[in-house]
Amino acid sequence: MEIIRSNFKINLHKVYQAIEEADFFAIDGEFSGISDGPSVTALTSGFDTPEERYQKLKKHSMDFLLFQFGLCAFKYDHTDSKHVTKSFNFYVFPKPFSRSSPDVKFVCQSSSIDFLASQGFDFNKVFCSGIPYLNQEEERQLREQFDEKRSQANGAGALAKCPVTIPEDQKKFIDQVIEKIEDFLQSEEKRSLELDPCTGFQRKLIYQTLSWKYPKGIHVETLETDKKERHIVISKVDEEERKRREQEKYTKEQEELNDAVGFSRVIHAIANSGKLVVGHNMLLDVMHTIHQFYCPLPADLNEFKEMAICVFPRLLDTKLMASTQPFKDIINNTSLAELEKRLKETPFDPPKVESAEGFPSYDTASEQLHEAGYDAYITGLCFISMANYLGSLLSPPKMCVSARSKLIEPFFNKLFLMRVMDIPYLNLEGPDLQPKRDHVLHVTFPKEWKTSDLYQLFSAFGNIQISWIDDTSAFVSLSQPEQVQIAVNTSKYAESYRIQTYAEYVGKKQEGKQVKRKWTEDSWKEVDRKRPHMQGPCYHSNSFTAAGVLGKRTLSPDPREAALEDRESEEVSDSELEQTDSCTDPLPEGRKKSKKLKRMKKELSLAGSVSDSPAVLFEVPDTW
């Protein structure tokens, strides 16, 4: 079901009903871009730590807009042994509620827009008909403004006891307004008077003056023309009629506030249900959803984890599930489209699914990929097929595994990390995996270097894997850890490049953080303000500059790599990543404190809980 601004309110009860009845939900988002700086390859480095990946996405991806949100609710019909679905495709856009409401700035990435356009995406439905939204802080501020405005209006009695001080340059204007109102009140024919459009300050003076001069007998309100011009309308009313109009105005303003909260109400309903939320490669979806509809992401990864669990108590990533035993050996491609096709084949059994009455059905043969509602739908199908496969391995077999089964608990709250070679997931409920990286080197070099140059440099060390960090640094993984020190020693006298172990790289990075923290703790803010920003002794991955050009060194790339394209041509789009990625693929690819988290937890009456007891049969491995 397509939901835009014009039909959002009339269909909101259907959305709430679907959420209330569902066993679980599948979600998906479409964005205005992926990365505002580094290429997608650099954004998803193969040796990122979970903290580094979070910081990269937070810094380079959150200024894009999630402008289409897909939600598919799944409910199992025990009578007919089938899943009944209700799919929604929401177009979302942060249209300002009023002149005082947030005017959101966002960025677009040309490759992402071009790709969505090629898929038939209707951008007019976003920008002309998108559903507005507010995050919790924006909603709170608007409600405070509304309450303050009403208290000022209701407190006019206090102001009415004394005349209003009118600036000299506005006295003539106010005198003319009072003269018009006096003539209006003397007239028996006119029931209302429209004043000419004026400034906000002049309207305020009019309100205050009329509250003092005419405490009874008139009703004053501000209306807006089609040209967005605001003017005051004055009506003759008795006290009973005045109170009735004031109540109507209050009700209308409350309704407009709820309309401004808009799509966020759907996210709040999903969160408050406490039910399982399924996504595919869903880290960005979760980050954008929290960032846009709740609050800006915290600076610290651990705070983000708390916040994510607070908003969505149970998350499951089908990409991680498909990349884990017992699926890993029988599923070769975990991109969403290919996964959906594979799960229709032996040994899997595709589920029986039917759309609820009044909801359009999707045909997987038509492959409406990159429509968020359709992607959410097939994500849910993939989850059901894999969950039922786990059930088929039991003795006796269980043909239908519910969203509350302990069989799938090992996959809860672990989000797939794209292209990280040895850390498959971000663990929202505890510490992340810390693999040994004693076979990994950190290399800095001139920005002219290409992938082929690195392959030649390490040609004596056998098979290697390269993961670019930026234009002047990369991680190189050797096949044998004992060769690491040899490689480091060979670079001691090199002028154009530098090699250090992964442990040394991390140590210097931590040292830099400690120095930076010490400056803050010692309150050297005055010094910092008076002179240009100076970095601590941290060894930055992009700080190495070659003493000279390559000079007479002649690079002869290994024949195996002769066909390699230049580094610049290796950037790939998000859609290409989705087509080729796997967790073992060697290809490179305002802070809120705990008080705010507690307040969020209090505001969100989250139903349901995640059991701490692990499943016995299947476990997401601690090592990869």
From Swiss-Prot:
Which SUPFAM superfamilies does the entry link to?
R3H domain (SSF82708), Ribonuclease H-like (SSF53098), RNA-binding domain, RBD (SSF54928)
Bias kind Acidic residues: ranges: 567-579
Q: Does the keyword Thylakoid apply?
A: no
Q: Which positions bear Phosphoserine?
A: S523, S543, S569, S573, S575, S605, S609, S613
Q: What does the entry's cofactor note say about binding and number?
A: Divalent metal cations. Mg(2+) is the most probable.
* UniProt xrefs under PROSITE patterns: R3H (PS51061)
First-listed, main subcellular location of the protein, grouped into a coarse class: nucleus
Q: How is it modified after translation?
A: Phosphorylation by MAPKAPK2, preventing GADD45A mRNA degradation after genotoxic stress.
Q: Which residues carry this modification: N6-acetyllysine?
A: K213, K492
Where in the cell is the protein located? Nucleus; Cytoplasm; Nucleus, Nucleolus
Q: Which residues form the R3H domain?
A: 171-238
Needed cofactors? Mg(2+)
Which reaction equations make up its catalytic activity? Exonucleolytic cleavage of poly(A) to 5'-AMP
Q: Which GO BP terms sit in this record?
A: box H/ACA sno(s)RNA 3'-end processing; miRNA catabolic process; nuclear-transcribed mRNA catabolic process, nonsense-mediated decay; nuclear-transcribed mRNA poly(A) tail shortening; poly(A)-dependent snoRNA 3'-end processing
Give residue spans, biased composition: Basic residues: 592-601
Kindly name one Pfam family recorded for this protein: CAF1
| Chain positions of site Interaction with poly(A) | K319
Lineage, top-rank taxon, reads: Eukaryota
Q: What is its EC number?
A: 3.1.13.4
| PANTHER family associated with the record | POLY A -SPECIFIC RIBONUCLEASE/TARGET OF EGR1, MEMBER 1, POLY(A)-SPECIFIC RIBONUCLEASE PARN
What is the role of the protein in this entry?
3'-exoribonuclease that has a preference for poly(A) tails of mRNAs, thereby efficiently degrading poly(A) tails. Exonucleolytic degradation of the poly(A) tail is often the first step in the decay of eukaryotic mRNAs and is also used to silence certain maternal mRNAs translationally during oocyte maturation and early embryonic development. Interacts with both the 3'-end poly(A) tail and the 5'-end cap structure during degradation, the interaction with the cap structure being required for an efficient degradation of poly(A) tails.
Q: How does it assemble?
A: Homodimer. Found in a mRNA decay complex with RENT1, RENT2 and RENT3B. Interacts with KHSRP. Interacts with CELF1/CUGBP1. Interacts with ZC3HAV1 in an RNA-independent manner. Interacts with DHX36.
The molecule here is called: Poly(A)-specific ribonuclease PARN
The organism named in the record is Mus musculus (Mouse)
State the organism's lineage.
Answer: Eukaryota, Metazoa, Chordata, Craniata, Vertebrata
Q: Which gene encodes it?
A: Parn
